């Protein structure tokens, strides 16, 4: 499976940023409020990132024990289906993080360019933006953890 391209992530950020800015502009022009993310979105996004990192720990331990030869006995292998599920979850988390980053960045640009900046409306969106960045970073890190080590027998 190919790793996620940074170009794909950038496209998701750009597209969702345009949508976030466009919807915010549409809402304000029609007398509605600027969309504000609840604090629960930031908390649940951060929790998903922590859980994903926790799911990758057994894979990281197994990979480390193989590459560094910390034990004399062969380590217990990780279920390959488990590893694939964690890998797919990390890819989904990275793309979701990119979409949330773009959305919140677009909304924040609209909020900061408004004639009156309401601090109560920007704080939850900034918090959600930080949580989305965390989710994106964890998605990339876990994807690297799930990468197979190079086979040394092919090199010889």
Regions found by a protein language model. Give the residues of each.
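Long, highly hydrophobic alpha-helical transmembrane signal-anchor segments
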Residues: 1-49, 105, 112, 119, ...
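Alpha-helical transmembrane segments and their immediate juxtamembrane interface regions
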Residues: 2-3, 114-155
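Alpha-helical transmembrane segments of multipass membrane proteins
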Residues: 16-20, 48-52, 131, 135, ...
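Membrane-interfacial segments
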Residues: 27-31, 63-67, 109-116, 146-154
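Hydrophobic alpha-helical membrane-embedded segments
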Residues: 39-61, 136
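Membrane-helix interface/capping segments
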Residues: 56-83
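Loop-to-transmembrane boundary segments
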Residues: 83-97
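Alpha-helical transmembrane segments and their membrane-interface junctions
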Residues: 94-114
